[in-house]
Amino acid sequence: MKYRQIVFDIDGTLIDSEQPILHSLQEVLLHVTGRKYPLEDLTFCFGITGEDTLKRLDIQDIPAAMELWFDILRQHESEMVLYGEIEELITHLKKAGYGLGIITSKPRILFEQDFGKFHISRYFHPVVCADDTVEHKPASGPLLKYMELSGAEKEEILYIGDSVYDSKCAENAGVDFALAVWGSHTKTTPANYYLKNPLDLLSVL
C-alpha cells in the first residue's frame, strides 16, 4: 500500500457545489455592493476561504457579508450533490483499509451543513476545516495539521483536489497530489496524477 491516507478537498472534488456557491456569492455581492458580478468573474473563490474571497473583492464588513453568505447558502443546500462514482469510490477505499480524511477551506459550520448530510461523511477522520489552522491553502498549514492529527507521514498521504490552491498546498507540504479533473477549472494544474473520473483513483493506488 503506497499511500495510507487518502485526503480529499470537498467542493469540486467530493460534491458538485459550483452553481450554489457562485450564485449565492453573486447574491451577496449584489446586496452589499449593488453590483451584479458575472459568475465567471467569481470562480477564483474555489479553493480559498470565504474571508479571503471577500477580501479580494474589497468587501469592507466581512463578518456581516459572511453571515449573509451562510444564510443564502442554506437556501441552496439541496442543490449540492455528490459527484457520480464518489460514493462507490469512498466505500471501496474504506473496505480496502485506507484512512480517509478531508481538508477544506470551509469553516466547520459550513462543512457540517454542506457535507454532513451525506452518509459517507462518517467515514472521514480527521477533517481539517478553515477554523482549525492559522495558515490556509495554498500554504502547507492545513496538510501539516492533518499530519499532526492523523499521525501519517507526508509520504503516506495522497491529497485529491480540484484547484491550484490544493496543488500548491500539497507541494508546499511535500505531499503527492491528484487533480480531480471532473471538477476542475484548471486542467493543467501541476499534479502527480490526473484523474478524469473518481474511480480512476483506484488505478494509481
Where are these regions (language model features)?
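N-terminal helical cap/lid subdomain that shapes the substrate entry/recognition surface
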Residues: K2-E88
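Conserved Lys-Pro-Asp/Glu-containing loop-to-beta segment of HAD-superfamily phosphomonoesterases
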Residues: Q5, K137-Y165
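A short, structured active-site edge motif that brings together acidic residues
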Residues: D41, S121-H136
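Short, acidic loop-to-helix structural element flanking the phosphoryl-transfer center
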Residues: Q75-I102, R108-E112, S140
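Acidic, Mg2+-coordinating phosphoryl-transfer loop and its flanking beta/alpha structural elements
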Residues: L158-Y194
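Short amphipathic alpha-helix with an adjacent loop that forms part of the alpha/beta core around
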Residues: L201-L205
